[in-house]
């Protein structure tokens, strides 16, 4: 085995990396492109590196942190992940986005008793910034209004 492959294994033993991230890390360590590609191909062949596994774990972590599909999709695209792969994994969660957005709202605003127009706008912007689309946000506010009798 090569030094690039050994270095890739050490990196992958700590956490999942996308193929592009792993390639960048190995290049930063001073390995030439040919060795990096060989190490990356060997890691994929042996199942040590998988973009699918990376996407699933990344999405799970970001959902847990209160982020929505738009922000997650953009972050993964910036990490060099195939958009079709991103879409297929995000699609598996499509029925849960309202619950995830409601959980993010509750974490930030649960103890809030001010439901003025400006406060609702602030809450709307917060959910938009977190990556939830307008349809999901409107469903969250319908739920909030019904449960808090606004």
UniProtKB/Swiss-Prot annotation:
Annotated PANTHER family: REGULATORY PROTEIN RECX FAMILY PROTEIN
**Gene Ontology, cellular component aspect:** cytoplasm
Family to which this protein belongs:
Belongs to the RecX family.
Q: Which UniProt keywords apply?
A: Cytoplasm
The record's subcellular locations are: Cytoplasm
Keyword Transferase tagged: no
GO BP, one annotated term:
regulation of DNA repair
Name of the molecule in the record = Regulatory protein RecX
Task performed by this protein: Modulates RecA activity.
Report the gene name: recX
Coiled-coil annotation reads none
Q: Can you name the source organism? A: Legionella pneumophila (strain Lens)
